[in-house]
């Protein structure tokens, strides 16, 4: 149980982020979830309230350094020092490299990777002072195996893994762990938009013969956030139905 530990989950409006926020809340965490808009923040606040979870939603653009700093200050004031950070916010801008525009590359690296640097850096001091903390980064199977048309996304997600291993070595002596969860193909709004042929092709690559559920990812995050994972750091937990085995 997480016993009132303040948890920040970015990109928590729906899908994987929402499932993580709800699961950590059920485990006893106080949950601060972020969205890109005030409407999204209200959505987060509403579902936390409906589930009987203590916490709130906050509007935050992870690419705006000043806004990120102000939001974390607001979370600290309203909820307390952040003990668990889940870097989940992410976007896609798929294109073949020959056709990729600079902004498609830059948008992905900024949102998916630089935000992890920015948020992790800001939560470190209170975690170091408390001599405990958990940073959990949501990467992707694509960051390990690659995918045509996603050089930008794969680079960002692979970068998250390298970042996490390096930071784990820097701050392990302060009892702060840094780990990744790497989802495979998950049943979300994006995969539901695929036609039957595309879905069948995806499922054909997965030994468990189904798409993952958002709850599968939330359960992995809850494990890494909880006491059972106190001796786990610098690891990447693959949750992909056997699509990638290492």
Where are these regions (language model features)?
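Conserved glycine-rich Rossmann-like NAD(P)H-binding loop of the short-chain dehydrogenase/reductase
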Residues: 27-44
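Substrate-binding pocket helix/loop in short-chain dehydrogenase/reductase
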Residues: 96-97, 101-109, 191, 202
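Alpha-helical segment proximal to the catalytic Tyr-Lys
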Residues: 125, 169-173, 230
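Residue(s) in the substrate-gating loop at a strand-loop-helix junction
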Residues: 140
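Conserved glycine-rich cofactor-binding loop
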Residues: 6, 13-15
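Short, small/polar-rich loop/turn modules that mediate ligand/substrate recognition or access, typified
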Residues: 172, 177, 232-234, 240
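Active-site helix of classical SDR
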Residues: 120, 156, 164
């Amino acid at each position: 149980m997480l016993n009132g530990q303040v948890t920040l989950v970015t990109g928590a409006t729906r899908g994987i982020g929402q499932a993580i926020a709800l699961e950590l809340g059920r485990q006893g965490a106080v949950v601060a979830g972020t969205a890109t808009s005030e409407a999204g923040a209200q959505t987060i606040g509403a579902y936390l309230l409906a589930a009987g979870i203590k916490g709130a939603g906050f509007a935050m653009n992870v690419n705006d350094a000043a806004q990120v700093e102000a939001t974390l200050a607001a979370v600290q004031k309203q909820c307390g020092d952040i003990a668990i950070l889940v870097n989940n916010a992410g976007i896609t801008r798929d294109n073949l490299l020959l056709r990729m525009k600079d902004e498609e590359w830059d948008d992905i690296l900024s949102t998916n990777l630089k935000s992890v640097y920015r948020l992790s850096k800001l939560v470190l001091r209170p975690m170091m002072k408390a001599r405990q903390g958990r940073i959990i980064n949501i990467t992707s199977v694509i960051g390990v195996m690659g995918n045509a048309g996603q050089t930008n996304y794969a680079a960002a997600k692979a970068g998250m893994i390298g970042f996490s291993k390096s930071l784990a070595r820097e701050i392990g002596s302060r009892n702060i762990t840094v780990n990744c969860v790497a989802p495979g193909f998950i049943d979300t709004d994006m995969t539901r938009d695929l036609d039957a042929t595309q879905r069948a092709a995806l499922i054909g690559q997965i030994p468990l013969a189904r798409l993952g559920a958002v709850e599968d990812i939330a359960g992995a995050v809850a494990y890494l956030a909880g006491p059972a994972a106190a001796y786990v750091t610098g690891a990447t937990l693959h949750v992909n139905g056997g699509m990638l085995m290492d």
